[in-house]
């Protein structure tokens, strides 16, 4: 597939504030393709196949309990690979279909892929990347507040991702999220100005 000229992969570790940045970018008029929302929908559509793989222990009131499934896959790379083998190809296909439509607008847009740097070989057509950065200590604090996970569960989730520091030299744009929402909004505004200049729009 040829390069997606206007695509910018939006990525960052768990607890870096990636979803907040995606929301702010939408407020400023940018399109954001959300890999997680595609994944959540496909998880429901492929419930039978997922239960066949992992058993009925991941169900709660007849539906997949994402916390139970997360505990299984984040604690075991083999289990995670099995889930990814089922879900990743259709997620990727849908992302690329949406991206092709947005290319026609000749305006930069974002593809929110949490594990973009880990899965970079699957997206060679995406040449620009935006990393949302926060130090690991801050990631842990935010995850504790938001997800009520144990320290063991937090470490398992962080361990399933490339260390945030390793991603820094791979990114074209880096947005630091170490302050409050007002600080982040100002960072996003500065970023938008840079992107508009770079894309001549």
From Swiss-Prot:
Q: Where in the cell is it found?
A: Cytoplasm
Give the Pfam families listed for this entry: CoaE
The entry lists its GO molecular-function terms as:
ATP binding; dephospho-CoA kinase activity
Where does it mainly reside? cytoplasm
- For whether the record's keyword set contains Nucleotide-binding, the answer is yes
| Cellular component GO terms held in the UniProt record | cytoplasm
What does the record list as GO biological process? coenzyme A biosynthetic process
Reactions catalysed = 3'-dephospho-CoA + ATP = ADP + CoA + H(+)
Which stretches are annotated as coiled coil?
A: none
**Which residues hold ATP?**
15-20
Q: What is its EC number?
A: 2.7.1.24
UniProt keyword Transferase present: yes
Q: Which PANTHER family match?
A: BIFUNCTIONAL COENZYME A SYNTHASE-RELATED (PTHR10695:SF46), DEPHOSPHO-COA KINASE-RELATED (PTHR10695)
Q: What does this protein do?
A: Catalyzes the phosphorylation of the 3'-hydroxyl group of dephosphocoenzyme A to form coenzyme A.
Name recorded for this polypeptide:
Dephospho-CoA kinase
Q: Which organism is it from?
A: Wolinella succinogenes (strain ATCC 29543 / DSM 1740 / CCUG 13145 / JCM 31913 / LMG 7466 / NCTC 11488 / FDC 602W) (Vibrio succinogenes)
Which taxonomic lineage does the organism of this UniProt entry have? Bacteria, Pseudomonadati, Campylobacterota, Epsilonproteobacteria, Campylobacterales
């Amino acid at each position: 597939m040829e390069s997606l000229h206007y695509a910018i992969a939006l990525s960052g570790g768990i607890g870096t504030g990636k979803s907040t940045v995606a929301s702010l970018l939408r407020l400023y008029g940018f399109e954001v393709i959300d890999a997680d929302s595609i994944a959540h929908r496909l998880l429901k559509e492929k419930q039978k196949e997922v239960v066949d793989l992992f058993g009925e222990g991941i169900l709660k009131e007849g539906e997949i309990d994402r916390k139970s499934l997360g505990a299984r896959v984040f604690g075991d790379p083999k289990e995670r690979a099995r889930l990814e083998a089922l879900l990743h190809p259709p997620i990727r296909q849908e992302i690329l279909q949406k991206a092709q439509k947005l290319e026609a607008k000749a305006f930069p847009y974002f593809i929110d892929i949490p594990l973009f740097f880990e899965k970079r070989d699957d997206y060679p057509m995406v040449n620009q990347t935006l990393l949302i950065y926060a130090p690991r200590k801050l990631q842990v604090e935010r995850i504790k507040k938001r997800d009520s996970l144990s320290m063991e569960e937090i470490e398992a989730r962080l361990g399933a991702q490339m260390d945030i520091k390793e991603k820094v030299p791979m990114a074209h744009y880096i947005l630091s999220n170490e302050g409050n929402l007002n600080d982040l909004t100002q960072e996003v505004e500065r970023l938008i100005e840079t992107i508009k200049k770079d894309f001549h729009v």
